[in-house]
Amino acid sequence: PLRWEEGNQTRIMDWLPDDDENILVMIRMSNARSPDVIKLNVKKNSIKTVKKGVAGVGYWMTDEDGRVRIGNTYDRNRSSGSIIFQEEGSTKWRTIWDYSSFGEDSVSVLGFGKEPNKVWYEAYKDGRIAVFSADISKQNIEPELVYSHPKRDVETYLRYRKDKKDPIGIG
C-alpha cells in the first residue's frame, strides 16, 4: 500500500509499544507540503490515515498513548513557526507558541509524559537552551525549569524507561 516516490520521505514517529501490529508513520500522501500520519499494520501490510496533512504543518508528534497532539508549523516567508496543540478529547487545534526561526523565542517540544497535557520542551534561558515542562492545556502556560546549565546549551532529548510514560532524564 505504501509506494516509493522520489523525494517523499517517510519517518517512523511512534513505535506504539503497546501494539504489536502497528506503527505510526509520517508520509506526504494527501498534501505535498505536509505529512499525513498513517497507522501501518506491519503484519497485514495495510494502512489507515490517522491525521491528514494540514497546510503549513511540517511535523507531527504523538503523546505517550499514540495520539497525534502536537504539530509544528513553519512560514518560510516570515521565517517564523508555531506549535499547535490538540487537547485530549477535543477535535480543535490551537496555537500555543509562536516564535521566530533561529531566535531566542524559539520552542521545540521534546515529548509528553504520563499526564496527557504535560510536555517537556526546549527553549532559551539566559542565552542558552534549557529544558522546561508545562501543562499546555492552560490558556496561560507557566513554564517550569527542569534543567539549565550556566555555561552551555543543554543536550535535549528525553530518556524513557520501557515501562514508564514519564521521562526519567534528559541527555
Feature map (PLM): residue ranges:
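Beta-propeller folds
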Residues: 1-171
